[in-house]
Amino acid sequence: MGGTFDPIHQGHLVAASEVADRFGLDEVIFVPTGQPWQKADEPVSPAEDRYLMTVIATASNPRFQVSRVDIDRGGPTYTIHTLRDLRAEYGAKVQLFFITGADALAKILSWKDLDEVFELAHFIGVTRPGFRLSDAHLPADTVSLVQVPAMAISSTDCRARVSRGEPLWYLVPDGVVQYIAKRRLYQK
């Protein structure tokens, strides 16, 4: 599951759990982006903070793992590089699924090396409340759209709540709330 995870929240975790169950996945690997190219003009928390929040959030689920592949590579993060690295690590016999939000999937036609991206993994677009995605332009054999239990939580809203001094309890895992407070993330 790729994402900025700034911060990771319960919606990410529910989506990963639902997809793992529906597709019979042995594990879900969370891959926090290093330098997200789509957000080059937006402030993004340091990669190490986003990685550690993801580790904290996923620690209690034995099916969840966290990879540093994008963070350790350096430079802008492109999905093609992530998939090539994961393919090299896991081998050709392992089927890769790339879980992402439907909002990100809507922009997939602008992604680098798109044809190879679809050769390396099956994409699962998780729908969010209030977001509709037409899959007419997406290759049906390599893309699935999945509805998960509605959780109207976004990382953008979580950051805004912290900057306004509002609580994050139950929107993100408890350990992530504590990490954000300790590191003073998202405060003005």
Swiss-Prot record:
NAD keyword on record: yes
S-adenosyl-L-methionine recorded as keyword: no
Assigned EC number: 2.7.7.18
Record keywords: ATP-binding, NAD, Nucleotide-binding, Nucleotidyltransferase, Pyridine nucleotide biosynthesis, Transferase
EC primary class: transferase
Pathway(s) served: Cofactor biosynthesis; NAD(+) biosynthesis; deamido-NAD(+) from nicotinate D-ribonucleotide: step 1/1
Domain of life (superkingdom): Bacteria
Entry's family note: Belongs to the NadD family.
Name of this protein: Probable nicotinate-nucleotide adenylyltransferase
Species of provenance: Salinispora arenicola (strain CNS-205)
Gene transcribed to yield this protein: nadD
